């Protein structure tokens, strides 16, 4: 059994146990209604299934922190079924099924350092860096003067993913993307 904490100590990206399953806290909200007891509404992602649920706790409740191994690894390659990662300290290779990565796989780049979460030796989750730099390999050309950032166009990046970018972005440009949302952050000059 893991460590228990008061629900008021919950933080984003914390790992908790709910109904015997490990969850990652995506967001939370302390609610203090005019009448009745305060409560905490938690939006959490099941680390095994990927399902996102909302859980409501009374402010007096405590929660159990999930207890599993976290290892920093580097992405190596995809073999059609699994994504392979290498532990930079030991040289160990770990295969992570595509189902565990889900949509995050579209932002994986060779050599990218990630955190792999293991439950009894089995990979149950992967955390990519919050943002990363990608090269635009395909998009409609931008025109001089197109500096408005509110209008977006699709662009294919070097991992094959398609993201929305401002009109002034051209093929060959390097851009920073939020890997959690897939949103454009900024153009990078290298």
From Swiss-Prot:
SUPFAM superfamilies: Nucleic acid-binding proteins, Translation proteins SH3-like domain. Transmembrane segments: none annotated. The keyword Cytoplasm applies. GO terms for cellular component: cytoplasm. Keywords: Cytoplasm, Elongation factor, Protein biosynthesis. Pfam families: EFP, EFP_N, Elong-fact-P_C. GO terms for molecular function: translation elongation factor activity. It comes from the Bacteria. InterPro entries: Elong-fact-P_C, NA-bd_OB-fold, Rib_uL2_dom2, Transl_elong_fac_P/YeiP, Transl_elong_KOW-like, Transl_elong_P/YeiP_cen, Transl_elong_P/YeiP_CS, Transl_elongation_fac_P. GO terms for biological process: peptide biosynthetic process. Pathway: Protein biosynthesis; polypeptide chain elongation. It is found in: Cytoplasm. Involved in peptide bond synthesis. Stimulates efficient translation and peptide-bond synthesis on native or reconstituted 70S ribosomes in vitro. Probably functions indirectly by altering the affinity of the ribosome for aminoacyl-tRNA, thus increasing their reactivity as acceptors for peptidyl transferase. Belongs to the elongation factor P family. This is Elongation factor P. It comes from Persephonella marina (strain DSM 14350 / EX-H1). The lineage of its organism: Bacteria, Pseudomonadati, Aquificota, Aquificia, Aquificales. The gene is efp.
């Amino acid at each position: 059994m893991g460590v228990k904490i008061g629900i008021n100590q919950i933080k984003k990206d914390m790992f908790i146990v709910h109904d015997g399953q490990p969850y990652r806290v995506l967001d939370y909200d302390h609610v203090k209604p005019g009448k009745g007891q305060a409560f905490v509404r938690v939006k959490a992602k099941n680390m095994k299934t990927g399902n996102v649920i909302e859980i409501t706790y009374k402010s007096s409740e405590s929660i159990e922190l999930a207890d599993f191994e976290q290892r920093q690894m580097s992405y190596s390659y995809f073999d059609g079924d699994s994504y392979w990662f290498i532990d930079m300290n030991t040289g160990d290779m770990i295969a992570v099924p595509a189902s565990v990565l889900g949509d995050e796989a579209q932002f994986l780049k060779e050599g990218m350092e990630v955190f792999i979460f293991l439950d009894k030796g089995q990979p149950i989750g992967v955390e990519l860096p919050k943002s990363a730099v990608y090269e635009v390999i395909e998009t409609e050309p931008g025109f001089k003067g197109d500096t408005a950032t509110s209008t977006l166009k699709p662009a294919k990046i070097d991992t094959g993913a398609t993201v929305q970018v401002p009109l002034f972005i051209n093929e060959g440009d390097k851009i920073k993307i939020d890997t959690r949302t897939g949103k454009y952050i900024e153009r990078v000059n290298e």
